[in-house]
Amino acid sequence: YLADYITKWVLGINPSSILEPSCGDGRFIQALFNNNSEKEKNITCFELIDSEADKSKYLLKSLGFNNFSVYSSDFLRWSVDNFKADQIEFEGIIGNPPFIRYQYLNEEFQESAKNVFDLLNFKFTKHTNSWVSFLISSLSFL
């Protein structure tokens, strides 16, 4: 229900480009289809786990979407690397970011989470959950 609700809300503004920063096996991709999304929308997805990213790629193809990219990589690291790239912008964001406490993230992800805060000039504490970094990072590309 969450995926359909959020996706319907985002599609209400008729975005031409959509970011899904933690796509997993494609629940929000399915929600795009369920909510009659135009197949030409530019959809950009990220997923850490290769097998889950592959599922999302397959789902996008099988549902008839034809303008998409699925990256099997860390969205937070990508966002840090591309933060000042003026040409990267999305009109809508869908997804359900990971809810992991900072101290349970591996060192690489801890560094990426902190870097997001630093780049956006937000105060960072080690009590910050991973979803916050995903949210503020995603919003910076709107």
Predicted regions and their residues:
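SAM-dependent methyltransferase catalytic region
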Residues: 1-142
